[in-house]
């Protein structure tokens, strides 16, 4: 990441679900505002998370990762849940080379500054999550994205304990054309729940992939 890279922030509003390997994809036809589903988009994601030796970031409800693959490759800082969602700040990778073979994961100064109120170096490896993701855009009548549905096959390693795990999960995240008011969002995600449960999915047992990788 170059010194002049600019961060971009957004609020993620999403629901997560646990599913079995054989669970079929949901039928989204009853979702409010959704008239079509975009083509499957495969993504090969590799995320490496860090924290301090004293787990200062975890105590603050913050996750810091460097992820490659997908449209938002880069460094990400996810804040704690606040109301309906979590604020995520993203920096592009640019000339960052900290995932070259054998390289140490070095947290860039801009990312360190973003979490300075909660944590200070040194940062150490916390977990690595590799994700074979298939993404689908849920589109309205104008072709705008109401939400994104992702089907994730995750392989995780807890770097502290050397423990490995694997699972499948789904996420549905509101997009730019999604409902903006609380009532509309509630109705939308109620319909998402109904579609997921009808397909055989269930509410996620963990609040995040990182939490599940760490056994929480």
Mark where each language-model region is:
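Phosphate-end processing signature that detects enzymes handling 5′-triphosphorylated RNA
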Residues: 1-216
